[in-house]
Regions:
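Short, flexible hinge/linker loops that cap or flank conserved catalytic cores
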Residues: 48, 73-75
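Histidine-centered divalent metal-coordination motifs
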Residues: 66, 84-85, 116
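Short beta-strand element of the alpha/beta-hydrolase
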Residues: 77-85
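The serine-hydrolase catalytic nucleophile loop
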Residues: 86-100, 113
Length: 133
């Protein structure tokens, strides 16, 4: 019985959809991370001002997965895909590098992996399913 309880806690902590907004709300202006989070927030506002499109695909297991595409002024060209980390918010994590690559003339795609942001999915699969998306 105890093993089932431990397994259930482990499952919920690792695989369930995270509550990112709650985590960001816990940072205080006195924390060492405050300056970094302020820079990320400013880059997020800046990237939102760029022309962009919301893209959506249907995964092999019928989940609607979304992303944001920022085309460069150069038509065509290379697209950089900025992938967020485990339990991260795609735009918050990718705005800073996305702006950097966009300023160099690249198209930028910021996808929301399954079970993150507006993409559907109840569980994070650590790449085992995402690799087919």
């Amino acid at each position: 019985m105890l093993e089932k309880f431990k397994a259930n806690i482990l499952f919920r902590q690792l695989l369930k959809r995270p509550n990112i907004d709650k985590a960001y709300a816990m940072v205080k202006p006195t924390d060492s991370w405050y300056d970094t989070i302020t820079k990320v927030h400013n880059s997020l506002a800046e990237i939102h001002r760029l022309p962009h499109e919301i893209l959506e695909i249907t995964s092999h297991d019928n989940l609607r997965l979304k992303g944001i595409y920022y085309p460069s002024a150069n038509k065509g060209g290379v697209t950089v895909i900025c992938i967020h980390g485990y339990t991260s918010h795609a735009e918050r994590e990718s705005a800073f590098p996305g702006l950097f690559y966009h300023s160099l003339g690249y198209n930028v795609l910021i996808p929301y992996l399954r079970a993150h942001g507006p993409s559907e999915g109840k569980y994070i699969a650590f790449g085992s399913l995402e690799s087919m998306d």
